[in-house]
Design a protein with these regions (language model features):
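Structural preference for solvent-exposed beta-strand-turn elements
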Residues: 28-31, 47-51, 55-440
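Cysteine-centered motifs
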Residues: 23, 30-33
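Intrinsic disorder/low-complexity segments in short proteins, especially the signal peptide
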Residues: 6-7, 18, 32, 37, ...
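N-terminal hydrophobic alpha-helix used for membrane targeting or insertion
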Residues: 10, 14-17, 158
Length: 440
């Protein structure tokens, strides 16, 4: 119930009140809508549902509450497209429009867009459109409805009239979804991107897969909450390098510099963006177009366009923690080492996960002692010619790094029990890992 501060025409804008009836006039036709009629103080009135939709849908600004569209699309195509965009939408939103996906139909194409204000994903698919139109609907509900429809379904999306709902039909199933106007939907993709280049999806996938595990989840050090992507070396012989670290371990992977990337600034791509890009290039097929500025990055993968803000911070001078004088080389069979670490760590404490490596000659003994649950030891054959050494590591971190080694042999370059260890694949170049030791 609202208290008016001036005279109101009978039923204006869907108002019921002193006249006991709703307005029969079309919206925008009365003095109240036009803003020319004064309002008498103390008059109580109620706004009808239609009036509320008009009021809060931006009717005073001339925004159109109604929308008309009709789209026919294959269920499999719509589900795949929704799968690309709906993950961006947070489950809990204080801003209603951010819980929605923008649905836009025009000229034989259906476009879907979702955003969380930091990340935006757009996808488009072929569809029968007559007429075109646009609106927004709840993203996760829309996805779940389409997912649960039978395979092979033809889906019809239709909006018309002033009900502000999108109707969905497939076979004998009927749904209606509440909508919010397109005019409320934010556009993150706007703005110029000063640098652009292309690279194979397989190369981008390698950069991400081999560094993502080391991204920090500690929000206080926000500048570590992503992958640092930058040019290393000279423009002629440089590389595109990806680095991630959480302060306990560091991953660095590089590949030949793509054409056009030489002048790009160093950027930090957020963890959520990295995860979404990783899903989109899961097959590693085709090329990816990359555009970026100092504040945003855009990936175009087929029909999918992902635009993201970058982390506004300075990545630390990671080169200082990469050891260059470690002269104790421990050469291990990757599978044997990984399996042994996994077995003995079964009894480690959930908090510490410490595993001790005792190295003498051609023998490595891995041991774990947990006062609360027990102990474990295992011995494997290795290649090691330096002085005997005892050193401890977090077993989970060791396993994370071992999982990135593609070849049969891993090399651990050691110094002493208190210094970082450099780990590399003996057969593959372009990737290295640094792991800080722990007391055992």
């Amino acid at each position: 119930v609202f208290a008016a501060t001036g005279p109101v025409e009978a039923g204006a804008l869907g108002i019921e009140g002193a006249w006991g009836k709703a307005c029969a006039k079309p919206l925008h036709s009365c003095d109240f809508c036009a803003g020319t009629s004064p309002l008498p103080s103390g008059l109580a009135f109620r706004v009808t549902p239609a009036g509320r939709r008009a009021w809060f849908g931006g009717i005073f600004k001339g925004a159109e509450a109604d929308f008309s569209m009709k789209v026919t699309v294959e269920r499999a195509e719509l589900l795949k497209s929704l799968g690309h965009v709906h993950r961006v939408v947070e489950r809990r939103n204080t801003i209603p429009i951010l819980a929605n996906v923008l649905v836009k139909a025009d000229r034989g194409k259906l476009s879907l867009k979702a955003t969380d204000l930091d990340l935006e994903v757009t996808d488009s698919i072929a569809a029968e459109v007559s007429p075109g139109g646009s609106t927004t609907v709840p993203a996760h509900m829309f996805y779940e409805i389409v997912r649960k429809l039978p395979e092979g379904s033809q889906i019809v999306l239709e909006g018309s009239g002033d009900r502000a709902v999108l109707a969905l039909r497939a076979g004998r199933s009927r749904f209606t979804l509440q909508t919010l106007p397109e005019s409320d939907f934010p556009d993150l993709a706007a703005g110029e991107m000063g640098h652009s280049f292309k690279l194979a999806a397989a190369d981008l996938k390698r950069l991400i897969d081999k560094t993502q595990f080391a991204i920090s989840t500690e929000e206080t050090r926000y500048y570590l909450n992503g992958i640092y992507l930058h040019v290393a070396g000279t423009p002629k012989s440089g590389t595109l390098r990806a680095v991630a670290t959480d302060g306990h371990r560091l991953a660095q992977v590089e590949l030949p510099l793509p054409q056009g990337a030489a002048g790009m600034p160093g950027i930090i791509v957020p963890r959520k963006t990295v995860g979404e890009v990783q899903r989109l290039i899961e097959t590693g097929e085709g090329d990816v177009a990359v555009e970026l500025s100092s504040a945003k990055i855009r990936f175009t993968i087929g029909n999918v366009v992902l635009t993201s803000k970058l982390i506004d911070g300075t990545f630390p001078d990671y080169a200082r923690v990469i050891p260059v004088n470690n002269d104790k080389n421990l050469v291990v069979d990757k599978k044997d080492f990984e399996a042994a670490v996994d077995r003995v760590s079964t009894v480690s404490s959930e908090r510490g996960r410490a595993v001790k490596l005792s190295i003498t000659g051609g023998r490595l003994v891995l041991s774990v002692t947990n006062p609360d649950s027990g102990s474990a030891t295992e011995e494997i054959e290795v290649d090691y010619a330096a002085d005997p050494l005892d050193i401890g590591f977090n077993s989970r971190y060791l396993l994370d790094i071992a999982a990135q080694i593609e070849g049969e042999v891993a090399v651990l370059k050691l110094a002493d029990p208190g210094s970082p260890t450099l780990i590399q694949d003996q057969d593959a170049k372009g990737a290295l890992y640094v792991l800080m030791p722990m007391r055992v």
